[in-house]
């Protein structure tokens, strides 16, 4: 696997501006940013889970992508079909650094950064099939309780290919997800239709873990309109993403997310 770490000069500037601020919101955001990324801490159940999934043979040629944690709203929301007025953009749901930049709320934002990396742009010119995995912290203004945290970890992946090479189907996606359920969790699973702004058709998968059916992940075929928003045409593919804490809790039979 090839690791691609994408840094943002704008993120560095915004972090410096936070350091100069003394208001409550700035202090709170700084504290969240300083929290460890458990998906990269050896020995953490979160890291163990992300490593086990990444190690599946079907992901052998996928890139591992690390992206900024402070992202512009037009990238996080507009490009993903969440326009002005969408509930996800509410300041009651999302941590705003300023009017145009927020703490990332969902993992698929890595698509944009990945597609704009110089190496990947060159591979697109060569009409290569591309696969990538991204995991790390995300931030939402959820009320903290036994099953929710406002800072948690997501794992996402996608596979895209030129239209003239292959047309990826829902069955291809479900085969990939079945691989995770059976080989990582040794679990029974089932799919049902859902809706997401950036995939169509979309599916959620439930898995039976330790005798309980739990919502495991969201997935779907990548919307062509979203790819066009990011400047890419002539490609198609699948994507999925899920919260690592939810699955770690289920597999370890933990009663409270705060025990992780």
Protein language model features and the residues they cover:
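TRNA-recognition modules of translation machinery and tRNA-sensing kinases, especially anticodon-binding
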Residues: 2-260
């Amino acid at each position: 696997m090839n690791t691609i770490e994408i840094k943002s000069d704008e993120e560095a500037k915004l972090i410096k501006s936070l350091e100069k601020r003394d208001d409550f919101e700035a202090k709170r955001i700084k504290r969240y940013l300083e929290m460890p990324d458990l998906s990269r801490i050896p020995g953490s159940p979160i890291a163990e889970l992300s490593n086990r999934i990444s190690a599946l043979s079907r992901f052998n040629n996928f890139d591992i992508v690390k992206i900024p944690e402070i992202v512009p709203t037009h990238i996080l929301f507009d490009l993903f079909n969440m326009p002005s007025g969408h509930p996800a953009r509410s300041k009651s749901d999302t941590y705003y650094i300023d009017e145009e930049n927020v703490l990332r709320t969902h993992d698929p934002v890595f698509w944009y950064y990945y597609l704009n990396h110089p190496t990947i742009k060159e591979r697109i010119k060569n009409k290569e099939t591309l696969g990538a995995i991204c995991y790390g912290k995300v931030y939402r203004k959820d009320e903290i309780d036994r099953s929710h945290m406002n800072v948690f970890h997501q794992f996402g992946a996608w596979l895209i290919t030129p239209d003239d090479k292959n047309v990826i189907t829902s069955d291809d996606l479900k085969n990939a997800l079945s691989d995770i359920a059976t080989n990582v969790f040794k679990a029974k699973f089932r799919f049902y239709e859902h809706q997401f702004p950036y995939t169509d058709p979309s599916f959620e998968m439930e898995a039976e873990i330790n005798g309980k059916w739990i919502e495991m992940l969201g997935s779907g075929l990548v919307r062509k309109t979203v790819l066009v928003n990011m400047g890419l045409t002539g490609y198609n593919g699948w994507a999925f993403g899920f919260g690592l804490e939810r699955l770690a809790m289920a597999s370890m039979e933990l009663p409270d997310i705060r025990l992780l």
